[in-house]
Amino acid sequence: MRAELQFAPVDGIIRRNAGGLRVSAEAAERLAERIQAHGASLAVEAAEQANNDGRKTLMAEDFGVEDVPNRDSLELPIAPVDRIARLEIADRYRVSMDARIALASILEVYADRIARAAATLARHADRRTITDSDIETYFDLPERE
């Protein structure tokens, strides 16, 4: 899968959850990969919902979002999120702007949850840097937040 999401906004999300910890470039890269895979999966489900409703356009409601946040409040840029949404769905589908913003907000909450856990794992290991292994360890935990 081609990387659609730049690491800088993902690094920003990790840093806002890191407290005083440093963030490795590999951690941002790994989280960006996870965000992208999760976003593509959510878009497939949203496309199925739109198809069931007889539509070719994905709407915010297809992602389970009723109140779409202001796009300026999001760290993740909309253009890469749009490309992520289109990775695994058929070309016949369109993605509305509200759906893009809704997906970005979902992915940001997802990233925040993982970043918080990664910071906790780094502190537990008595390290001052969040690494890619902290991101991956989150997914190995039997009980996630």
Regions found by a protein language model. Give the residues of each.
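Intrinsically disordered, low-complexity terminal regions
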Residues: 1-145
